[in-house]
Amino acid sequence: MKCVHILCFAVITFCWIWMLPLLIVGAVFSIPLAIITLTISILISLTLQWWFHGTILPNNVLRRWISCCPWHEWFPCNTIRIADVSVVAVHPHGVLCCGALAGIHFVPESQTVFCVAPVLFFVPVLGWCVRALGCIPARYDIMLLALRKGHSLIVVPGGVPELVMSEVGDDYKTFERSGFIRLAREAQVPIQSVFVKGECQTYDMWKAPFHVNRVHLSWKLNIPLVFPLFLGWYGTWLPKRTPLVLKTQRMESTTQEEYYSYLKRLQQEK
């Protein structure tokens, strides 16, 4: 037998005899390691949340470094600079809020603050960095504090229900809410409404049954009830290179009915 044959024979017999026992032993020993890692991660997340409670970091070095990358060229999309303190309401949500992130938040010299789901702050590694990226928990008191400190606030009013609605790929479907309107009124700042044409085409999603029921239940539970398979650029997790068009309109104090009436007109503009 040649050396290569002996080597092949050794590998095959090793796998045949030892692979299953090693997998079983590895699985058994990985359970305590996973529990320890999870416990440490949760403790770190809780400590950071307590330590940085109410802290707003719109100009952290990590965000400045990430903003140097021309993210808007990926799709491509136009960019919007927010000059005055305002509530920037972006529609629709889509999967990743690509228009809001690439076209407004991660733009060089942008000082906006992005409202995200509070649970993100407890995700290991990502949650430890998300505040340094200019994000705050989407809680009314913290959002109001940010506005009173002079920071423009990016909100995606449709939230989780609108993420579920993006299954159908229709940018014009919105889940109406009024909390951000009350917020702007209380802080006495205008609303900058932004419509992102093409947002729902950045990913292909599986159209599961009971769509209307899942949208309603997602709103109640604040959990996106969708099949966790998002196909982007060439089937990867990257968003598709779909051109995005950001349209914007400034609105002063308004009601929910008036706001969504203005939004429909903005959506229809060419």
What are these regions, as identified by a protein language model?
Residues 1-4, 44-57, 202-217:
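Compositionally biased, charge-rich terminal segments
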Residues 61-84:
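A short, well-structured juxtamembrane/interface segment
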Residues 71, 85, 111, 152, ...:
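A residue-level signal for beta-strand positions that form part of recognition/binding surfaces
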Residues 34-46, 65, 111, 124, ...:
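Catalytic cores of glycan-processing enzymes that make or break glycosidic bonds
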